[in-house]
Amino acid sequence: MYAVVKTGGKQYKVAAGEKLKVEQIPADVGAEITLDQVLAVGAGDQLKVGAPLVSGAAVKATVISHGRHDKVKIFKMRRRKHYQKHQGHRQNYTELRIDSIVA
């Protein structure tokens, strides 16, 4: 069984037992959270698509850790004007373990 959930402005296809890195969620490590914005639920060749959400569906997950992604380097330059700008960015994430899908 799999589900498509929406969290942090992005959509993820998840199944029970998978690990997933999502945008940072304010929850403690080891806490169990519920992702209730389920867009679709499927099992085998059957698929249930919500409009926009599947009613009564939820995904239970456990917070494994919090961390930061690798640095993305931004470099801006204007030719012939001696203008250069260096910038870096590291996005925070929360790693989840999908425990169960309730449909």
UniProtKB/Swiss-Prot annotation:
Keywords: Ribonucleoprotein, Ribosomal protein, RNA-binding, rRNA-binding. GO terms for molecular function: rRNA binding; structural constituent of ribosome. Signal peptide: none annotated. Pfam families: Ribosomal_L21p. GO terms for cellular component: cytoplasm; ribonucleoprotein complex; ribosome. InterPro entries: bL21-like (IPR028909), bL21-like_sf (IPR036164), Ribosomal_bL21 (IPR001787), Ribosomal_bL21_CS (IPR018258). PROSITE patterns: RIBOSOMAL_L21. GO terms for biological process: translation. Belongs to the bacterial ribosomal protein bL21 family. Part of the 50S ribosomal subunit. Contacts protein L20. This protein binds to 23S rRNA in the presence of protein L20. This is Large ribosomal subunit protein bL21. It comes from Ralstonia nicotianae (strain ATCC BAA-1114 / GMI1000).
